[in-house]
Amino acid sequence: MQRHVFARNFRRLSLLRNPSLTKRFQSSASGAANTPNNNDEVMLLQQKLLYDEIRSELKSLSQVPEDEILPELKKSLEQDKLSDKEQQLEAELSDFFRNYALLNKLFDSKTLDGQSSTTTAAATPTKPYPNLIPSANDKPYSSQELFLRQLNHSMRTAKLGATISKVYYPHKDIFYPPLPENITVESLMSAGVHLGQSTSLWRSSTQSYIYGEYKGIHIIDLNQTLSYLKRAAKVVEGVSESGGIILFLGTRQGQKRGLEEAAKKTHGYYVSTRWIPGTLTNSTEISGIWEKQEIDSNDNPTERALSPNETSKQVKPDLLVVLNPTENRNALLEAIKSRVPTIAIIDTDSEPSLVTYPIPGNDDSLRSVNFLLGVLARAGQRGLQNRLARNNEK
């Protein structure tokens, strides 16, 4: 009730009755009008003193009990009527103090409008950033305050303006990749798949994948990329639907996140660090100490104890997907010797004859690699869902 009554009569309180504030305000206004070329430091000092005094008056006023402030309000209302100039100045001061109280969160808008029923008055505003050290009024903003002002400005203006549709967001290629049948030449070009290597690094075996040359860079034919990508997606979907093991390989910096998401979608595996020589051709020495277990068609462990022959049996992936075949040539050679089919992104400096299902495209850009990898992972995810749905029907 105390805050409610005080807020309801806050606008009626005439601060012109305070001689010190009136004198300070008039002296500051007259000084600024009579001396247009006044020193800036003197003006800042006068403004700081005025703001400090106003702030102290507001804080002391917010702590005055209701029993003491109501008689003062009644006396103020019972006094003689103010002149037109005084009423105008009082209205301007009331608006100023109201805006100041709202800006500094001394009171909320409902309290000032007389809509709040809170019984206590807050002496200090609630700080959402308790570790923030505010700067003085006559000092420039600190780096923390500038950051918060920019953050507040971004929050207020981020949704302004026109709504843009049909925009390509590269970060969605990892988590929300498109289906293979929804891929178009425009989407491939947006991801930068058409950009090949420099003409000086060209490998002649990729001649059939090249559309042309532009400023010393080969341009890949995206029509062929689209065809090869859909074929590779069918292979990934078929292997995943049959319960095969898919191994994703990418050893360049920044590819790990995409490999993780692809392995999760297909229940496969990935290698994001150096390829260990002999992983496929000498697996008994490389992976002999790894623990093995049996899983059913739903990829759930059966908890059955394996015999020594089953434990020593070599386990190979049913499909190897390579993102950067130029650096992982040894992995492709091991897959050929182990008769493991491979899928790889073939740039204009790569060798397509080492890959079972090549995909012509840019293997240097993370945007391009994540796009192609996301499409393959989405195809594998659909194959996995088909397998699980078929098993649940039985």
Curated annotation (Swiss-Prot):
It is found in: Mitochondrion. One of its GO terms (molecular function) is structural constituent of ribosome. The keyword Oxidoreductase does not apply. GO terms for biological process: mitochondrial translation. Keywords: Mitochondrion, Ribonucleoprotein, Ribosomal protein, Transit peptide. Residues 1-25 form a transit peptide. It comes from the Eukaryota. Pfam families: Ribosomal_S2. Component of the mitochondrial ribosome (mitoribosome), a dedicated translation machinery responsible for the synthesis of mitochondrial genome-encoded proteins, including at least some of the essential transmembrane subunits of the mitochondrial respiratory chain. The mitoribosomes are attached to the mitochondrial inner membrane and translation products are cotranslationally integrated into the membrane. This is Small ribosomal subunit protein uS2m. It comes from Saccharomyces cerevisiae (strain ATCC 204508 / S288c). The gene is MRP4.
